[in-house]
Each structure stands twice: as C-alpha cells, then as structure tokens.
Curated annotation (Swiss-Prot):
Domain notes: The presence of a 'disulfide through disulfide knot' structurally defines this protein as a knottin. The cysteine framework is VI/VII (C-C-CC-C-C).
Membrane-spanning parts: none
Name of protein: Conotoxin Bu2
Disulfide-linked positions: C46-C59, C53-C64, C58-C73
Originating organism: Conus bullatus
Source domain of life: Eukaryota
GO cellular component: extracellular region
Prodomain positions: 20-41
Subcellular location: Secreted
InterPro entries to which the protein is assigned, alphabetical: Conotoxin
Family per record: Belongs to the conotoxin O1 superfamily.
Name of a matching Pfam family: Conotoxin
Record carries keyword Secreted: yes
C-alpha cells in the first residue's frame, strides 16, 4: 500500500514537471515564429508609392491609405 502511494505521488510529480516544461517551450516557439515572420517581411522590402500595402509595409515617407480597391502606399496628408 505504501509503495503504491509513493509510486502515484512520483508519477504525479513527474507529470507536473514535464507539463510545466512543455508549456514554456510552446511560448518560445510562438515568439520564434513571430520573429521569423518579421524577418520575412523585412527581406521583401518596402512598398513604393501606388503599390498595394494591405499586408506589407510602405517605404519611409509613405503611409498605407484606403481606397475602393484596397490600401495603397501614398504620401501622408498635411
């Protein structure tokens, strides 16, 4: 009986430790994915005046404006 209780407690303890470790790894995996997406977007370059900008960044000095056909990079309003 004592041996069974010790084994149950040991299994529960080890399960709790491994569950905690896997939760932390999942967070780091998500952070790594976000960093990878940023690197991919940065490598694509910026969008020039008149280019569509829904999911991409406009070049410096331009902003993504809305229109009937979707967003396009254009100079900011004064």
């Amino acid at each position: 009986m004592k041996l069974t209780c010790v084994l149950i407690i040991a299994v529960l303890f080890l399960t709790a430790i491994t569950a905690d470790d896997s939760r932390d790894k999942q967070v780091y995996r998500a952070v790594g994915l976000i960093d990878k997406m940023r690197r991919i977007r940065a490598s694509e370059g910026c969008r020039k005046k008149g280019d569509r900008c829904g999911t991409h960044l406009c070049c410096p000095g331009l902003r993504c404006g809305s229109g009937r056909a979707g967003g396009a990079c254009r100079p900011p309003y004064n």
